UniProtKB/Swiss-Prot annotation:
A biological process from GO: seed coat development
CDD domains: PMEI-like_3 (cd15798)
Record-given protein name: Pectinesterase inhibitor 6
Signal sequence region: 1-30
Amino acid sequence: MTSSSSSPITFTLLLLLSLLVALNPNPSLASTGSNINTNDIVTQYSTYVRNACNVTRYNRLCVRTLWPFAIVARNNTSKWARASVAVTITDTKRVLRLLLKTQRSAVGESERIALSDCRELFVDSLDNLYKSLAVLRTLNADEFQRQISDLATWLSAALTDDDTCLDGFEETSSRTRTVRMVRRKATKCMRLCSNALALLKKLAFDGL
């Protein structure tokens, strides 16, 4: 990780750690707070997120989007998978809002159709992501294999939806600023979904 990318991570982790110490009702923790080596702690949490993201194709994007969850997720594979789906949901909703806005100002029939089709695909993708998040919140050993199978189906479908949206823009001759912006944001969303699927595969391998 470069210094430019790790700097905001370090700052926010330090801020979160300070808040945890300040808000912790345990006096012993507060009294020993000055003895905590914050640099070592930040390094440890950075290691957690880097280790989690090692299995992903878009590693830098994974680290950048998931590091706020390091304090909670640590070495818990299921928490990392859940966090990645939650992040993808947030980004998918942003893309949907953008598609709704840009569809009204589309230039030409081919652009309007591409934006409309993309919106339908992202609606379906969001539905699959929500179903995935619901299951990730209720994982249990007795149903784990079935749950993993369902999750793989839904996340793969969400990724296919994102890919199909991008393919639609390849087929249109429109290269307006609107199309370029939507493609850029949809590409990020597709990559987040790919990372979520990779983390799910790690969860399937590691187990609960």
